[in-house]
Amino acid sequence: GGVSSTNLTREEARHRSEIIKVERYHVRIDVRGADADGATHFTSNTRVRFSTKEPDTFLDLLDGEIESVIVNDEEIEPEYDGSRIQLHRLHTHRKNLVIVTAKLPYQHTGQGLHRFVDPADGKVYLYTHFEAADSRRVYSVFEQPDLKAHVDFDVIAPSGWRVASNQVHEDIREEENGLLHDFALTPRMSTYLTAIAAGPYVRFDDEWHSRDGSESIPLGILARASLAEYVDHEEIFKITKQGLTFYHRAFDYPYPWGKYDQIFVPEYNLGAMENPGLVTFTENYIHRGPATRSELAGRTNTILHEMAHMWFGDLVTPKWWDDLWLKESFAEYMGAHASVAGTEYREAWTNFAVGRKAWAYTADQQSTTHPIVADIVDLEAARQNFDGITYAKGASVLKQLVAHVGVEQFFGAARRYFRELAFSSATLDDLIRYLEKASGRDLSSWVDAWLKTTGPDVLLPELTIRDGVVSELAVVCDSVDARTGRNVNRPHTLRVGLYSLRGDDLVRADLVDLTISSPRAPVREAAGKPAPDLILINDDDLTYAKARLGATGTKTALSHLSGLAEPLARALVWSMLWNCVRDAKLKVQNYLDAAALHSPKETEPAILATVLQQLQMAVENYLPDSTREDARRAEAARAWRGLDVSEPGSDLQRIWARHALALSAADPDSVERTRGLLDGDVTGLVVDPEMRWQSWMALAALGRASAEDLDAELERDRTKTGVAHHMAALTARPDDVAKQEAYRRLRTPGELSNEHCLAYIDGLRTPLGVETFADLNSSYFDDLEQIWQEFPIEMAQRLVVGLFPDGDVAEIADRWLASHQSATGGLTRMVKERRDAASRAETARDFNN
């Protein structure tokens, strides 16, 4: 079919930005009934002032019941199709004022104005999330990033509530049955960045001062009342202040949004969102038990990522979604860079190398890979591109660009970019222009090779040894565009590390700087050196490529990986080994044995957690059925041993405990250990509510937890997460009736919130529940289009990915794709990605047979 009117195209947006300039929105949102049982709608009144060169255009508003539309003092009959309000006979020589009043629904999908009822105390909370195009679920708007405007929010809310928006309060006054909160006018900004939150949130306050005392920024942290006791506001404020100090120095442009509030919200779809002055975060960043250092480092990274957006993304905004990567790669890069430069979390690039980069390599090797600069023709395509390429590959390539032009030049360019483009929109060409000025280099061929192609390069060491000495070392670079098959010769600025065994230590004997601009780059400095035991091609992780270890290096790594003193080097080698497992170039058993040997000696929490997760993935997906069950038992036993030898009370102990519980769900021999952990038998281990539920989940999956056991646990923890874990655990039991009911509810539109949808999927997808799930889900491929049509996109995505069948289904998926070529891009993209994962797993299972 044609493009639905809810789906704005790039051409329509381009046309609108040529003819329209928006002056300001005055938005009044009335949520006075929100705290009543079963409240479904709120009232929205928008007054938008704008000029236009043409008499006809449209405003965006989704799913509204329109009460009135007034155009320049004249009430008109609304011409509205559920997503666009058509406007005619507008003034082309003076300003227009359009006033729209409408009723709109509260959402339960985490987009628009989300309404949540806290099971702990019955309190109601509201918050908004608009990226990419959901401000139109709350007010009438020209919904595109380059039509910036000043926004003036008023919110009428129940009297006991706290209300926040992008700016500070100007006034609060009595209204019938409530209070009117009048917020200050915002600077010029994109509408997807506007935000409000309302409810009985608890608030913490602090203030940041610049070093010379000339500037101060009021800081706030908000969270639900039932979570407030767990909010470690001192740590969060500390990181926030360190970040503001760092960015003021690095960007040399004062924070432009007045105050800085950070709010933790329930049932949130993402990690966080950079609404200026009111940054939203998932509540997963608030820990109800001890947080490991890698969790704190991860949260720090996110806080600093969002803060970077205050300049890059909010102050200067990508003109359209094809430059989404501009802001995301930059923020992702800055999250790690600022962690290292401004906080105690100096290990950020190690965590990036072992975690985020794996996401990039996975995404970039799927059939759906796309260039970093993607071709985004409409909003539907934009939604699909919040992915591992836009974020993680983008940041890796930006890190390579910094290595290529120099860090001072990079920040110099950023400063000019903010200064000269403040409060406007920009494209890739703008950023590159500033980078070329700052570095004095022509970057056009670099941009073409890196940003307009797909797939990672493969880098291999080619080593000739004579009499124990290197006669020649070269790096062979296989640089192919995954989509076209053409050679693209991506240039690399990198370092090659030569490592030698001294006892059990793997010591870096030499580090060589190398630029690669051809298929084979000789490493001249290596000639005449003693033969290395391991060659780390991308040492210090400056570039983005799949580097291989070669036969000698792989052997050394498998036996001596923990002998590497530098955490970043260990992270890189683990990542290289994992890439080989995924590519069916290294046997799973070799990887498992290496993990058994080295993970008990691993001291970096992020590396340990990632390796243990990947090990479980390898057992479940890449081993043939014939050996999987034995491997599950063996790995669960190793996990409990790892827990036993870890230091009581340490982060590493928590990671081993989580790993042991994750593996126990598939190992009947682990029942006693799991019960013991639940009863507090593990010395030094704090068993918080999350870990209790993880234990119950394992017992439930093994058929060793009754509904009564799980109900009793819910009584202990009647909270948002408690309710979701309870649903998952009830479904995980080998009880066909419970599983059928969960499946039925999943497939009923409007039945579940986003979080409960995931809980049921988790409960159905336990390793031992595979057969029952396959029976329930046998019509998956027949039902795909129906799912896509019946559910809002956030839910449809969860179902398409979450219910994709296990096993050898690549061929069935191929048949579906071949016979559904007219299905929407969003749906086919997800099926292709699951199909690719299934096919990769089939190849690996054959290889490991």
Residue positions per predicted region:
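Glycine/proline-rich low-complexity spacer/linker segments in large multi-domain proteins
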Residues: 10-19, 101-152, 199-207, 541-567, ...
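Surface-exposed beta-strand/loop patches in extracellular or lumenal glycoproteins
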Residues: 47-63, 143, 151-158, 429, ...
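Long, ordered, helix-rich scaffold segments
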Residues: 358, 388, 470-472, 485-487, ...
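Hydrophobic helix-coil surface modules that form long, contiguous segments used
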Residues: 44, 130-133, 141-304, 333, ...
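A surface-exposed beta-strand-loop module
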Residues: 57, 62-119, 140-143, 182, ...
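N-terminal, polar/Ser/Thr-rich
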Residues: 1-43, 68, 119-125, 145, ...
